[in-house]
């Protein structure tokens, strides 16, 4: 009977030590949960980067194979035009104030640039 008590005491001590390691020791349950969240976030980041790499690879292939992509980039980013082409710039007119516009009542001329006082 006395041996059973010692065995029970040793098993209870072992169980409490294992529980302590599970909850508070290295590799505890909170740390495992945190690592699982980081794994999910890393998978999402990897997928986003895969899509970006695919997009960049398609753009590189397009630039290597087709002149249209190079021409489009030269026009939009560098403002270049082809020889013999005429470039027209469309400038929007400044809207004229309507009769019921409140700025016209205060003598504000929208066509003239505003001068700041010094």
Swiss-Prot record:
From the Swiss-Prot or TrEMBL record, state where the protein is found.
Cell inner membrane
Q: Which GO terms describe its biological process?
A: FtsZ-dependent cytokinesis
Span list, region Disordered: 97-118
- Chain segments annotated as transmembrane: 7-24
- State the GO CC annotations: cell division site; cell septum; plasma membrane
Note the topology in the membrane. Answer: Single-pass type II membrane protein
Compositional bias of kind Basic and acidic residues:
103-118
The free-text function statement in the UniProt record for this protein reads:
Essential cell division protein. May link together the upstream cell division proteins, which are predominantly cytoplasmic, with the downstream cell division proteins, which are predominantly periplasmic.
State how it assembles: Part of a complex composed of FtsB, FtsL and FtsQ.
**Protein name (record):** Cell division protein FtsB
Q: What is the lineage of its organism?
A: Bacteria, Pseudomonadati, Pseudomonadota, Gammaproteobacteria, Lysobacterales
Q: Which gene encodes it?
A: ftsB
């Amino acid at each position: 009977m006395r041996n059973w008590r010692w065995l029970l005491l040793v098993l209870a001590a072992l169980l409490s030590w294992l529980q302590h390691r599970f909850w508070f020791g290295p590799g505890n349950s909170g740390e495992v949960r945190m690592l699982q969240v980081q794994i999910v976030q890393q998978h999402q980041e990897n997928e986003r980067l895969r899509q970006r790499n695919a997009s960049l690879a398609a753009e590189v292939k397009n630039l290597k194979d087709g002149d249209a992509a190079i021409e489009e980039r030269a026009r939009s980013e560098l403002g270049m035009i082809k020889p013999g082409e005429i470039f027209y710039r469309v400038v929007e007119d400044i809207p004229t104030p309507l009769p019921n516009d409140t700025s016209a009542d205060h003598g504000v001329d929208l066509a003239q640039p505003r001068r700041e006082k010094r």
